[in-house]
Amino acid sequence: MRHGDISSSNDTVGVAVVNYKMPRLHTKAEVLDNARKIADIIKGMKVGLPGMDLVVFPEYSTMGIMYDNDEMMETAATIPGDETAIFSAACREANTWGVFSLTGERHEDHPNKAPYNTLVLINNEGEIVQKYRKCIPWCPIEGWYPGDTTYVTEGPKGMKISLIICDDGNYPEIWRDCAMKGAELIVRCQGYMYPAKEQQIMMAKSMAWANNCYVAVANASGFDGVYSYFGHSAIIGFDGRTLGECGEEDMGVQYAQLSVSQIRDARANDQSQNHLFKLLHRGYTGVHNSGDGDKGVADCPFEFYRTWVMDAQKAQENVEAMTRKTVGTAECPVGELPFDGKEKTAGA
């Protein structure tokens, strides 16, 4: 894995991430005009970065945030649809793969249910090869219907890719799920705003380290009249070190080459920091020295995860016992979310 050149090789996947300025749009026509702008950017980037195999745009980059619910429902897209047709044509022309945001994608029961927050991975032939729906929307603000699974797709030069979105990335479980399914590159598209800049930079680096995987983050920049977005799109190596990171500038681009062979060699041969292997071979040195086998312990020692899988309702009740029972809070109501008349007070 390396940074600083504009090339790539048979062993390296050239990945670019974009600090796309958050648009403020209201109509389908405006959305399609913006999609064409993104398509033109892709074709220009390929001229400057001839090794680019994959380009990643942030969450909300195509449609912006529709703060008006009627506009959100009216502009909700189908997949495939007009927006993806524009992106597919650009990927074919530029001979590159791309990750694009659709906020939102129409629910199967549209317009009776809220849309999904969706990413698509499109290959260099213009085919949609992965569609991921955000599993953990940013409540209480985001009103998206949650998705229910992650995916892994063989990407350019055989690199295995998973997609996650923004607030998903605050939960270590989703990173681990992608990595344990075989993901070598986890792409996190986000429309993250201040104040949580340092936390998000730290989270991406920590999850690359913890999951022995590459991470590509594309984040929005600018101000949309409601939120200010901090950019810092970045590409991170599987050892948790940043290869390249934008600042807060609008339309900043970072680029790095991610080696396919290096990550596979590390996962096969690293020992003390091979977190994926060691999690399912716990204590193998001591177990071997004790004459109890050569594989360590595979059983899950974490009661929370066992409860969640076997009895999700019980797990929910357990977390409510230490937090609260309603989704809203009386001291800072948001929208029409329900809340009790009084929350726990400090020390209660």
Curated annotation (Swiss-Prot):
Listed Gene3D superfamilies: Carbon-nitrogen hydrolase (3.60.110.10)
Domain named CN hydrolase: residues: 13-260
Record's catalysed reaction(s): a monocarboxylic acid amide + H2O = a monocarboxylate + NH4(+)
Superkingdom of the organism of origin: Bacteria
Pfam families assigned to the protein according to its UniProt record, in alphabetical order: CN_hydrolase (PF00795)
Enzyme class: hydrolase
Active site: 59 (proton acceptor), 134 (proton donor), 166 (nucleophile)
PROSITE patterns with a match to the protein in the record: CN_HYDROLASE
Alphabetic keyword roster: Hydrolase
Enzyme Commission (EC) number: 3.5.1.4
The keyword Hydrolase appears for this protein: yes
Protein family per UniProt: Belongs to the carbon-nitrogen hydrolase superfamily. Aliphatic amidase family.
Name this protein carries in UniProt: Aliphatic amidase
Source lineage: Bacteria, Pseudomonadati, Pseudomonadota, Gammaproteobacteria, Pseudomonadales
